[in-house]
């Protein structure tokens, strides 16, 4: 619930609080070092494409899912934005699809999965929040030899994030773009970045 609720209420503090409580840098956190299954929807709840109030947030919620600690799970059909409400009953939530519908969302999730699969930091790294506003969050996932910053802008306006990265020039793993951080990270409206 914290994932979609943070986007619907434009309150990134909600999901950040949960992630810090579960995986933060303190020794008392609940699941530090654990690899929990994480999802935005499943066979028993309203599909995330139906529950988000702004469709521009759909790719962003998956970016957050694949960037945060845990093992991301994508419920079949949700990778292309299938919709269904829990009030419609189980058959609506668990349909038989004739064939997959490849689209921008499924391509984006495929990129996220590839990035996650190939990143030690995203699979085993610690979690540190570096920038947090109601509509933006940047967090660091880091192991001894790799660091990835995950940056989300859920707003319809550009935002510049300053977060003290270890190096001034980074690569966005999603786009392949080389980004100079001297003036901060200029985040486009409704955007996500995985910076290494």
Report each predicted region and the residues it spans:
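Short glycine/proline- and charge-enriched loop/turn segments
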Residues: 1-2, 87-98, 175-176
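Conserved alpha/beta catalytic core and glycan-binding cleft of carbohydrate-active enzymes
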Residues: 1-88, 127, 134, 141-143, ...
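Aromatic- and carboxylate-lined catalytic core of secreted/periplasmic carbohydrate-active enzymes
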Residues: 24, 93-130
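Ser/Thr- and Asn-enriched, surface-exposed coil loops between beta-strands
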Residues: 131-135, 181-183
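Active-site beta-strand termini and strand-to-loop segments that position acidic
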Residues: 139-144, 195-196
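Beta-strand-rich binding/interaction modules
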Residues: 157-175
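Solvent-exposed beta-strand/loop surfaces of large extracellular or lumenal domains
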Residues: 171-185
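C-terminal beta-strand-rich structural cap/linker in extracellular carbohydrate-active enzymes
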Residues: 181-196
């Amino acid at each position: 619930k914290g994932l979609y609720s943070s986007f619907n209420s434009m309150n990134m503090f909600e999901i950040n609080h949960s992630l810090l409580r579960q995986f933060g840098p303190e020794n008392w956190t609940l699941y530090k070092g654990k690899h929990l299954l994480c999802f935005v929807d499943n066979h028993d709840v309203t599909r995330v494409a139906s529950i988000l109030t702004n469709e521009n947030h759909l790719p962003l919620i998956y970016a957050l899912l694949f960037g945060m600690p845990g093992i991301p799970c994508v419920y079949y059909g949700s990778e292309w934005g299938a919709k269904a409400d829990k009030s419609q009953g189980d058959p609506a939530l668990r349909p038989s699809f004739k064939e997959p519908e490849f689209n921008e969302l499924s391509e984006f999730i495929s990129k996220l999965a590839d990035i996650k699969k190939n990143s030690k930091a995203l699979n085993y790294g610690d979690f540190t929040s570096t920038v947090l506003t109601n509509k933006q969050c940047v967090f660091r996932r880091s192991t001894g030899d790799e660091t990835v910053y995950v940056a989300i802008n859920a707003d319809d306006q550009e935002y510049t994030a300053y977060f003290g990265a270890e190096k001034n020039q980074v690569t966005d793993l999603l786009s392949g773009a080389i980004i100079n951080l001297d003036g901060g990270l200029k985040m486009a409206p409704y955007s996500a970045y995985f910076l290494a």
